[in-house]
Amino acid sequence: METTPLNSQKQLSACEDGEDCQENGVLQKVVPTPGDKVESGQISNGYSAVPSPGAGDDTRHSIPATTTTLVAELHQGERETWGKKVDFLLSVIGYAVDLGNVWRFPYICYQNGGGAFLLPYTIMAIFGGIPLFYMELALGQYHRNGCISIWRKICPIFKGIGYAICIIAFYIASYYNTIMAWALYYLISSFTDQLPWTSCKNSWNTGNCTNYFSEDNITWTLHSTSPAEEFYTRHVLQIHRSKGLQDLGGISWQLALCIMLIFTVIYFSIWKGVKTSGKVVWVTATFPYIILSVLLVRGATLPGAWRGVLFYLKPNWQKLLETGVWIDAAAQIFFSLGPGFGVLLAFASYNKFNNNCYQDALVTSVVNCMTSFVSGFVIFTVLGYMAEMRNEDVSEVAKDAGPSLLFITYAEAIANMPASTFFAIIFFLMLITLGLDSTFAGLEGVITAVLDEFPHVWAKRRERFVLAVVITCFFGSLVTLTFGGAYVVKLLEEYATGPAVLTVALIEAVAVSWFYGITQFCRDVKEMLGFSPGWFWRICWVAISPLFLLFIICSFLMSPPQLRLFQYNYPYWSIILGYCIGTSSFICIPTYIAYRLIITPGTFKERIIKSITPETPTEIPCGDIRLNAV
């Protein structure tokens, strides 16, 4: 193994053509003048010393194929890096492990065959999710840019991908933080001797409110509702004051104050960059695991817990013959790991050049999947307890999905446990920290992208730009804080972001593997890590992962989800609205392709060639090294 240090300082004027020189701590390569002879078929991105097929032999400077040419741009200042390696790992884990791990995976698992679902889930993770995760970490670490400007170094015509990612991130921030606002409202309401969703004697309760756990004789009817359900729907959401999407009603000032507090925490956590957010995640990324452990032990000691675990894991192998099970497995692993959102590119761009991103991808992916699996035990031990207390089947208790599973079913179970106040406080605090990590990451992806794309405008004004982003997201969230805001949240989650980010990720995978070239990409990885990705990874990146994404997209388009929330059926026009919102993001990709071809001079063929040829090389900070296999 040969290593090349980048520590020496040389004047560019003292270098001959083709030599590697240092200026201001950044390695540069002197480019020959147009009159000089060069390799006519040389790859123009500057990363490789191996000429393209058909390259001429008449060259002034020949470079051995076993040597790596070190090339870099002259940049102002050095790029910020993580304070410690563990800061990066905790940030990535905190981003990947979010609210969906707690509510979505357990529900999907038991609905799709219980323990049998783990087979398609694992297969989809190995062949689809993890390869895409690894690809984004490697791209970000090598090119050291956000999701917009990185395409100048990969395939400029696809720069619209970066803009699409930023728009999607705004849509996600508009509804995701609202769910945290609900959790914060629950947290504040939990500081009482008796949790307010325990009884039916509150001002918001109706005559249909029936307490399962009351000592009085009760009769449960089809119209009966639990105290927890009425607290969630009539007090927190106040959804009864809205007639649907056509009449959302006013804004809940309580939720507006909650989300304002959340955005304040977000701002002061990310305003200074990854060195500050990297310290915050020491709390926000580790705290959920402490609470999950406490809740798991508590749930396991409850009567009837075994019924919930059996219901969760009992395999139904016949389910594997259904296409829907494999679709759910693919979608769950993709949205859980989170490639395609620009976050992994941003986080990895702050790594040291020789950081082992391959190992990071495997470790964080395994931690994420295991967290989802363990969260199922946390949820279903409590559901088993509720089924035992109600003398019902677990299937009757576990009918709620999505946020309702947390804010109604689990909240009701906690309210009827010993020390209910304590467990309610730590549970909703856990939900908030899970959400904060993902929000930190999502906004950092946008901030890094814009700062890298417009460094002369925003590089020294990061705090102001972060404030502008946070304020924009706050105002974008107002529509989800209305009395009918829950309808908007579900619409945005199902239609506005899901299909869009899948499409963006598919185009990104194709652009890297097919246009930039899998050989070139693997050569980049080898320069960083000293070894080249094996054939398994190459096949996944070129064929399996794109097919994996195409499979999910086609399945969604062929059988789109029928939206229903509580007793409200979404009108047909709302589905069209959802598709339009989703299209508004990834429409940036074909729009930029057309724009690029129009502004590029030359014939149409020349425009195509110039537009898919990398424009700029990658800077290697002084002090880093590239590893070259000899």
Curated annotation (Swiss-Prot):
The record's listing under InterPro entries reads: Na/ntran_symport (IPR000175), Na/ntran_symport_serotonin_N (IPR013086), SNS_sf (IPR037272)
Region feature (Interaction with RAB4A): 616-624
Its keywords, alphabetically, are: Antiport, Cell junction, Cell membrane, Cell projection, Disulfide bond, Endosome, Glycoprotein, Membrane, Metal-binding, Neurotransmitter transport, Phosphoprotein, Sodium, Synapse, Transmembrane, Transmembrane helix, Transport
Residue ranges for the region (Disordered) are 1-59
List the carbohydrate attachment sites.
Answer: N208, N217
CDD domains from the UniProt entry: SLC6sbd_SERT
- State its location(s): Cell membrane; Endomembrane system; Endosome membrane; Synapse
Which parts of the sequence bind Na(+) 1?
G94, V97, L434, D437, S438
PROSITE patterns in alphabetical order:
NA_NEUROTRAN_SYMP_1, NA_NEUROTRAN_SYMP_2, NA_NEUROTRAN_SYMP_3
Q: How does it sit in the membrane?
A: Multi-pass membrane protein
For this UniProt entry, the molecular function terms from Gene Ontology, in alphabetical order, are: actin filament binding; antiporter activity; cocaine binding; identical protein binding; integrin binding; monoamine transmembrane transporter activity; monoatomic cation channel activity; neurotransmitter transmembrane transporter activity
Chain positions recorded as Na(+) 2 binding sites: A96, D98, N101, S336, N368
Compositional bias (Polar residues) spans?
1-12
Instruction: Offer a single GO CC term for the protein.
Output: synapse
What GO biological process terms are annotated to this protein in UniProt? amino acid transport; behavioral response to cocaine; brain morphogenesis; cellular response to cGMP; cellular response to retinoic acid; circadian rhythm; conditioned place preference; enteric nervous system development
NCBIfam families, per this entry?
A: Na_transp
Write the protein's name: Sodium-dependent serotonin transporter
Gene source species = Homo sapiens
**Gene symbol?**
SLC6A4
